[in-house]
Amino acid sequence: MSNLKEQKIFDNDYKSAKFIGIKGHWSNDVLITHDNKLIQIIKLSGFSFETADDEDLDIKKDLRNSMFKGVGDSNAKIYTHIIRRKKVPYSPGYVNPDMPYGFPSYLDKKWIARSSQKESFINEIYISLIYKNSFIKNPVTEIQNQFLKKKSDNTAFLQAMHETHESLLEVSSRVMSSLRDYSPEILSIEKVDELYYSRPAEFISDIVNGIDERKIIYTTDDLSKHIVNSRLIFKKKYIEIKQHDGSSKFASIVSIKEYGPKTWAGILDNFLKMPFEFVISQSYDSINRQIAMSKMQLQQNRMIQSEDKAISQVVEISEALDRAMSGEIGFGQHHLSVMCIEENLKSLENAVSMALVEVSSTGGMSVREKVNMEPTFWGQIPGNFHYLGRKSTINTSNLASFNSFHNYPLGKAHGNFWGDAVTVLDTTSGTPYYFNFHLRDIGHTTIIGPTGAGKTVLMNFLSAQAQKFRCRLFFFDKDRGAEIFLRAINGKYTIVDPGKQCGFNPLLLPDTGENRIFLLEWLKQLVSVLGEPISAEDVALLTSAINGNYKLDPKNRKLSNIAPFLGLEGPGTLAGRLAMWHSNGSHARIFDNDEDVIDFSQANVFGFEMAELLKDKFSLSPVLLYLFHRISISLDGSPTMIVLDEAWALIDNPVFAPKIKDWLKVLRKLNTFIVFATQSVEDASKSAISDTLIQQTATQIFLPNLKATSVYRTAFLLTEREHHLIKTIDPGSRFFLVKQGIDAVVARVDLSGMNDVINVLSGRADTVLILESVIKEYGDDPEVWIPIFNQKLKESQNKTTE
């Protein structure tokens, strides 16, 4: 405090730069202060705690305790910060130029407008490591240092600084390793468009200028002068931060005055969803363990002698002493402050009230800074320990509780495998979640949800948002739930019904080695649907039939014309087993056709209704073999997604199960991923392919299920907390659980009030009938039929309610 008085801190016209204390960059990723401290700043994405079990959180707390103790033993000092800033997912007026015209663009604009109306925040976590130049710790040495610095040869000073730098990097390396689960990143100078910017300086600028999000160009000049971008006016209870454009922000600071008797992992987690911007600053300066233990013993003796009734505190001190004597914990001087930031004074008062309550909920006593406000403000800057007035001794286990480094995942907005994020989802914390199917280059995804949970709407919404990538889409539908949507995005929709003409003819495939291999597998499947074995002689006959097929004129290539190659029909013969598939056979209308209706060059989107096919155990595998083969040979490396509704019913069979693992790898190499969806977790749990899908899928989505059994945990390796969330989330809220890598988040697609969009994304038997009548009368141009469809649906609903 005396330092500030000497510099006339209450003169509102003073130059703020002198209090920052940052001289410049010692190296690309290390700052140096005016008193020769070195600082390295590490940014953390944080640990996804919302769905983690308490046991896991406690384990991570113990690991952080060990890390903090190690840092303290190395004589490094620590600052940590949480910066909660407003984040608009989309800039004002943003229109995605890559979204196809029509329904995808219409939906995208409405979703962007909805997302832009909501006040969103993100949490940024930082840990700063501060190392003092050992060469100037000793007063005598400091005099020598000043003398050396005045001489042209300052070798001793530089050597001392080099050693300090090496010590800092050694500590930093250990911290980076300890915090690997928190996705650490060292802030450094970065090059953008031929200019160099200082990210460490930008971090400090956020603290000083009330979270201003500006770029700071790297300079060899005094960096403090370039950090200040606002005029700071310190009032009695608040700070006015005047911006260059004439606008102002207002800030007040809440601190811990007295600490509570206990701490726990995630003690500050509620701050992570507060509806205002803030900067939480903490500092930790280790002290001698023996001195700390002596103070604790003295405090304990006083409590005992005064017959203090707080027996639990006496016991806790004994436990802490035991842990200290065993070297399990260290001690240090700690401060914690919360700078609340708002755009007007009324909102600021509300924010301060919430912060006071939340700090008090830790079990301690909170205070709003007034006289001590300005020193605390400058004390937020890493290295400015001398400005801090409210410091108390805590142990490293307490420090690990106050610094859980928990966070809500943000996903990844840019630089994903396909580019920008697929879409932005709402979350329970008010932070946006940038959703991607891909984690690195793996995009395979599972979506699990019971009937009525919103699975169809979610699948179709995500598929619609993915159209920005101009990707090809192959959608295997059930009960025509996606038909309206697929037709709305100009898709070709085919109802695959074994009892009707399907228009498939695999024998018209071009004569290639790959197609010949497929035809042999396909024919083998046709002649063994009743479980008959395939002999070597059978394989030879089938191969002969394939050879014969390609000797025929293309117009004659069909099943009924190659059947004679298999010999005479009779019970149990190869020709007899093929008879059901051609001519007058029970399933002849599927494959024995003069032409093949499949032409994947006609469009980018194709839908196949599979409900009737799923009822026919004979036809399912041969038809899927053909469709998947046609899709596979059409893949050329352009972005492609395949959606399998009721995936387990489609592919969990002896034909596909053995090859699913290799198939997924091949698709990945061809820039293609699959979305596996199902409503029956029990069926999935009994499946031979579930283990493979869990290992090969990057993203898992679980919709609420009030009847979720323990099968969820065993089949999909969920934590107890994740299982609990799935069971307790209100299905009407449209929230769901997204798991990707080590991250998990509760998110939702809120389409309330967008009935015209929901009508398209969610097909039902009655709405599909309306669609059929509208298309029959007005044609299949979505621009024409969608408005008419919505109007007729509205009229139908009005009649129902009358």
Model-identified regions with their sequence ranges:
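The conserved Walker
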Residues: 439, 451
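Extended, folded cores of ATP/NTP-driven motor/assembly subunits in large transport
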Residues: 1-410
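Short beta-strand-centered segment that lines the nucleotide-binding/catalytic pocket of NTP-utilizing
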Residues: 471-483, 497-498
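A short helix-turn-beta junction within AAA+ P-loop NTPase domains corresponding to the substrate/partner-engaging
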Residues: 491-493, 689-702
